[in-house]
From Swiss-Prot:
Pathway: Secondary metabolite biosynthesis; terpenoid biosynthesis. Its cofactor is Mg(2+). One of its GO terms (molecular function) is transferase activity. The keyword Metal-binding does not apply. It holds the Pfam family UbiA. One of its GO terms (cellular component) is plasma membrane. It catalyses: 4-hydroxy-6-(pyridin-3-yl)-2H-pyran-2-one + (2E,6E)-farnesyl diphosphate = 4-hydroxy-3-[(2E,6E)-farnesyl]-6-(pyridin-3-yl)-2H-pyran-2-one + diphosphate. It is found in: Membrane. It comes from Aspergillus fumigatus (strain ATCC MYA-4609 / CBS 101355 / FGSC A1100 / Af293) (Neosartorya fumigata). It is a multi-pass membrane protein. The lineage of its organism: Eukaryota, Fungi, Dikarya, Ascomycota, Pezizomycotina. The chain crosses the membrane at residues 22-42, 60-80, 101-121, 127-147, 155-175, 186-206, 233-253, 260-280, 296-316. This is Polyprenyl transferase pyr6. Belongs to the UbiA prenyltransferase family.
Length: 320
């Protein structure tokens, strides 16, 4: 039975269940915003001028729709996992697990966020091919919590794989919003593929570290997670994942990457991931959370790096 709350308390609870009071949802905005800036830079390099206010408007729409879609996904995840969350130290006080929020209110809130996200993506795409992109994203959100079940482990599927694929899929509508009908779908996919692979691998890496915080409770409750794959060699698994992330960056940059992106992306990320691997300690699961926060900082850094790349390619830095 949900606890009776004042309107102010209910608003705070709804913010809490969507993680809008934390940085987690902001991970979802990185692929779309990076992609808007990189796609706009690519078009400028091809001689197509895009007004700066138009590009920033598209980036704002990408930010807003992914943020709200992530919030809706958080509610769905917590509703499916509410009985498990109630038995895990880190998650037992979440609104649905603790009984602070009724299921009906949570579902309504989730649908409101989802509807707003659909509308914003439609605006970003100028009404073109909305459900071509939204349906795969929605499918990923629905499947994600079920990836934590022991049954999916038998199939070799881990929740990080689903989360990584969902994250990578937000790249496609962002590039499509910038290129419109000027590029055929197969060519657009070819342009996006390196960045999609990068997002898939990076998400698996930082979420493996993040989920390791719950290793004791997860083992007790048989919760499926990618670190289960490695047993006691979790550090080695994170090393392999980090190396894979770094190795994909030259694939992204080899065609159009400037000296700035080679430094700000490949150089900074290589150093940052090395520092994270040094920081992570299998004997102290809380270090997984610290690694996660450092990856959030990397995501913010890359937003700035991609924006500077756009300014460099478009010649906008000449005014400074």
């Amino acid at each position: 039975m949900a606890t009776a709350q004042s309107p102010t308390q209910l608003v705070r609870t709804l913010i809490d269940v969507s993680r809008f009071d934390k940085y987690n949802c902001l991970f979802a905005i990185f692929p779309g915003v990076w992609s808007i800036f990189l796609a706009a830079a690519s078009r400028h390099a091809d001689g197509v001028h895009l007004p700066s206010d138009w590009v920033l408007g598209r980036a704002g729409l990408a930010f807003a729709y992914t943020y709200l879609l992530s919030g809706a996904g958080m509610v769905w995840n917590d509703w499916i996992d509410r009985d498990i969350d109630a038995q895990v130290a880190r998650t037992k006080n979440r609104p649905l697990a603790s009984g602070r929020l009724a299921t009906r209110a949570a579902i309504i809130w989730m649908l409101v966020q989802y509807a707003a996200s659909v509308w914003l993506m439609d605006r970003m795409l100028s009404g073109q091919n909305l459900w071509t992109f939204m349906l795969p994203l929605t499918t990923g959100i629905i499947l994600y919590p079920f990836g934590k079940r022991p049954t999916t482990r038998k199939l070799g599927i881990y929740p990080q794989y689903i989360l990584g694929a969902s994250s990578a899929l937000t790249i496609l509508p962002a590039w499509a919003s910038v290129y419109g009908d000027s590029v055929a779908p197969p060519d657009l996919l070819a342009k996006c593929l390196p960045l999609c692979v990068f997002l898939f691998l990076w998400t698996i890496y930082f979420n493996t570290a993040y989920s390791y915080q719950d290793v004791k409770d997860d083992c007790r409750l048989s919760v499926n997670s990618s670190y289960v794959l490695a047993g006691q060699y979790v550090h080695g698994l994170l090393l392999l994942q980090a190396v894979a992330v770094v190795m994909v960056i030259p694939w992204i940059l080899h065609e159009n990457g400037s000296a700035w992106l080679w430094f700000s992306w490949l150089g900074v990320w290589t150093a940052a991931l090395a520092e994270q691997l040094y920081l992570f300690d299998t004997k102290d699961p809380s270090t997984g959370g610290r690694v996660h926060r450092r990856n959030f900082a990397l995501g913010i850094w890359n937003v700035l790096a991609c924006f500077v790349e756009l300014l460099l390619v478009s010649g906008s830095l000449d005014m400074f």
